[in-house]
Amino acid sequence: ACASASVAIRQGIIGIASGLYDVVLAGGVEKMTTLPTNETTLVLATGADMVWETYAGYTFPGLYATMATAHMNEYGTTSEDLMAIAIKNHDNGALNPMAQFGQTVRDVMNARAAKAKEKGRPVPSWADEMEFLHDPAYNPVVAWPLKLFDRCPITDGAACVLLVAEEIARDFTDTPVYIIGTGQASGNALHDRESLT
């Protein structure tokens, strides 16, 4: 799941560079919303080390929370730093009409306040997005120190890239994008890493 599309692109580049192919269509697809959340979570958990991590009770949020805690201890990263990332990411997503979440954190905050008013509940009055993200009623802890807005959703998506040999690129476009390098690496399971950061 996590890297199959990028590996497909790299394999396409290698295939073209070797002369084996002139044209490669590389893509990736992820369809995760047809299963109930608990089943999807179980499937995702198989990406972790089944002997040491999954059976010890780790979930993916728990693994990332462990790394976040280590980063906080080693570099002084704060929850506010993570909140700033969430705000920035939602701001960028709001600029993309195809984004899963086309709302800024401020949009979400205002919608929550409007919903509370509509339901006759006390209307929260957050000063800004940071104060909203500090509110555990709207941004609960998923796996400390990570909160709801720090996590990625279960989602569907797909993308593809048409790769062509340089000598025929102009047959497809007047402004080709050139790939000047590629690389690939793989990490160890969390318990085998020398550093969690």
Predicted regions and their residues:
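Active-site-proximal alpha-helical scaffold in enzymes
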Residues: A1-E30, G62-G102, V161-I168
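Polyampholytic, low-complexity intrinsically disordered segments
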Residues: A84-I87, N92-V164
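Condensing-enzyme catalytic core mediating Claisen C-C bond formation in acyl metabolism
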Residues: M50, T54, N73-E74, M83-I87, ...
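Glutamate identity and glutamate-enriched acidic tracts
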Residues: E30, E39, E53, E74, ...
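Conserved catalytic cysteine-centered active-site region
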Residues: A1-V24, K31-L63, R106, R121-R151, ...
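Short acidic, glycine/serine/threonine-rich loops at helix termini
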Residues: L35-T40, A94-M98, L190-D192
